[in-house]
Regions:
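Active-site acidic catalytic loop and adjacent metal/ATP-binding pocket
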Residues: 1-22, 32
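Active-site activation/catalytic loop segments of kinase-like enzymes and analogous catalytic loops
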Residues: 18-59, 67, 71, 93-113, ...
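Amphipathic alpha-helical interaction segments
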Residues: 40, 76, 86-90, 124, ...
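C-terminal structural cap/anchor segments
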Residues: 52, 79-95
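ATP/Mg2+ or Mg2+-diphosphate-binding catalytic cores
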Residues: 104-174
Length: 174
């Protein structure tokens, strides 16, 4: 809802791919944003990263602040030649990795820790994996082979699970 407060959980924060944060926010395991909206926000994110430039650092600033400013400037320089299409590809590949990991985590929480409430979120996460595989299968033959296996073998098993429900594909890049 428009007036609800959201919480960003950063307890597992680690250094990772530049597109991990946008994947986590825009392809959340509990809510789905339309692909067009995701890409609009992703383009804005890339634009802001690319425009970081050189922040002004005063003599009063501590060494960590100056170091962070230097990192931001370096990041902006590294992103100068990254196209929106390339950044989107990184986003989709990072999303594939993240959501495959989440499928495993949610299964573990159910099987080992007896926390079955996460099973309700598996259909959305499965759909994210399928979408990412459809979008990135041309990136490498191993991704295409994995997609074929996932669709033919794993989806046959997934469809038989009590938690599985088909999600409407309208608005998905499938």
């Amino acid at each position: 809802e428009a007036n609800e407060v959201g919480v960003i959980d950063f307890q597992d924060a680690v250094l990772g791919p530049i597109t991990y944060d946008p994947v986590s926010l825009l392809k959340d395991c509990y809510i789905r944003w339309p692909r067009a909206q995701q890409l609009e926000w992703l383009d804005g994110y890339l634009m802001r990263l690319s425009n970081l430039g050189a922040p002004e650092v005063s003599i009063k600033d501590t060494a960590p602040v100056a170091e962070q400013a230097s990192r931001l400037q370096s990041l902006a320089i590294q992103l100068e030649n990254v196209t929106a299409a390339q950044f989107q590809r990184w986003f989709d590949l990072t999303g594939l990795q993240r959501h495959l990991r989440v499928l495993g985590v949610f299964a573990r929480l159910h099987l080992r820790d007896h926390k079955s409430s996460y099973l309700a979120d598996l259909p959305l996460v499965t759909k994210y994996v399928r979408e990412a595989l459809a979008l990135t299968a041309d990136s490498h033959s191993s991704v295409a082979e994995f997609r074929d296996w996932f669709e033919s073998e794993l989806m046959a098993v997934i469809r038989k699970q009590s938690w599985y429900e088909a999600i409407d594909s309208q608005g998905w890049a499938l």
